[in-house]
């Protein structure tokens, strides 16, 4: 996994809970504890810069991802441009695709082979594309209720295991994680609604670290849960309303905010040590959803203020 080279501006990281803490409902003072832990954590020298795409009118950029060559992939919800837009570092469009394929585009991820995957929060489709936009695999997860309220009733995110399997978070209306083989054959699913271990209230993002541990952003429970790949509960972190996760070697990045605040409120990008569960670094953010760590060691966040995606770049 890519290693993030950033400058730390302060000292020792502080966390609210270790990675092995037993599951529990976030306490009434969870926001106070979270803010104290974040305040004590070291800041990181990254500055947000809006991503502008000349000549393209985008809607909300729900999620962002990047390839090893630095290409950034934006997944946007407007009707005046293709849903998937690939841009270079200067925001110039390299290619785009996806018109007519989506109801509510939600997450976009680039797998280790450079293929581009997307989820749809309304239709339950999970689509795998070549880097040029050719459909390679189209899975209908199913199980969404009818009618679909506000177009949010299905898949949220996707993660890739070292053996080629992939895991889908099905969070809107459902509370489950599904595992598929590389060819799209469903192997198993696990999870249920609730606040206990292995239960979810909107599993919004999913990632797998180099050790094979599965991390699920249990958004409305205000925590990140950890599992093995069969769904066995390993522990949790109580770090607020986490929208996005991004694995980065020995660290996991969280795009998060206080649990009781409205969605897309100001919060933080937190760099958490996966072995200790402690915050190793922080970057303030004006709004949170999907995020990505680029091969360059810089961050992408979608959306930021005014629903515009942002680069988080090192000062020059």
Residue spans of the language-model regions?
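Blade/loop signatures of beta-propeller domains
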Residues: 22-48
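Beta-strand-rich domains and repeat architectures in extracellular enzymes and scaffolds
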Residues: 31, 49-82
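Gly/Pro-rich loop segments of beta-rich domains
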Residues: 41-59, 91-104, 136-154, 185-202, ...
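Beta-rich, blade/repeat-based domains predominating
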Residues: 56-69, 100-115, 144-165, 195-213, ...
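Conserved beta-strand positions in repeat-built beta-propeller and related beta-rich domains
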Residues: 74-78, 116-121, 168-171, 214-219, ...
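A short loop-to-beta-strand structural motif that recurs across blades of beta-propeller domains
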Residues: 81-86, 124-128, 175-179, 223-225, ...
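Short loop/turn segments that connect beta-strands within beta-propeller blades
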Residues: 87-92, 130-134, 181-185, 228-232, ...
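Blade-level signature of beta-propeller repeat domains, shared across WD40, Kelch, NHL, RCC1
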Residues: 287-316
């Amino acid at each position: 996994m890519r290693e993030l080279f950033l400058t730390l501006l302060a000292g020792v990281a502080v966390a609210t809970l270790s990675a092995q803490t037993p599951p529990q409902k976030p306490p009434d003072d969870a926001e106070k504890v979270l803010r104290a832990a974040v305040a004590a954590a070291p800041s990181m020298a990254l500055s947000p810069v809006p991503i502008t795409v000349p000549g393209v009118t985008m809607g909300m950029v729900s999620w962002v991802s990047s390839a090893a060559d630095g290409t950034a992939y934006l997944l946007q919800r407007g009707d005046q441009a293709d849903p998937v837009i690939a841009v270079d570092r200067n925001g110039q469009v390299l290619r785009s695709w996806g018109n007519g394929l989506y109801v509510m585009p939600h997450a976009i991820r680039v797998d280790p082979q450079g293929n581009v995957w997307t989820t749809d929060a309304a239709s339950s489709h999970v689509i795998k594309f070549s880097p040029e936009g050719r459909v390679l695999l189209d899975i209908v997860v199913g199980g969404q209720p009818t009618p679909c309220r506000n177009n949010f009733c299905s898949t949220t995110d996707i993660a890739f295991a070292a053996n080629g399997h992939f895991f889908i978070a099905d969070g809107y209306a459902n509370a489950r994680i599904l595992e598929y083989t590389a060819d799209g054959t469903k192997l198993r699913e696990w999870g249920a609604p609730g606040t206990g271990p292995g239960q979810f209230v909107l599993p919004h993002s999913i990632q797998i670290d180099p050790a094979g541990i599965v991390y699920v952003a249990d958004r409305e429970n205000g925590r990140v849960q950890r599992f093995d790949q069969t769904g066995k509960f390993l522990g949790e972190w109580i770090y607020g309303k986490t929208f996005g996760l991004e694995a980065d070697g020995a660290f996991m990045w969280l795009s998060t905010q206080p649990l009781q605040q409205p969605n897309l409120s100001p919060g933080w990008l937190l760099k958490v040590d996966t072995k200790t569960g402690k915050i190793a670094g922080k970057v303030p953010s004006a709004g949170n959803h999907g995020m990505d760590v680029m091969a360059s060691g810089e961050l992408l966040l979608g959306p930021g203020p005014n629903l515009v995606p942002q680069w988080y770049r090192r000062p020059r």
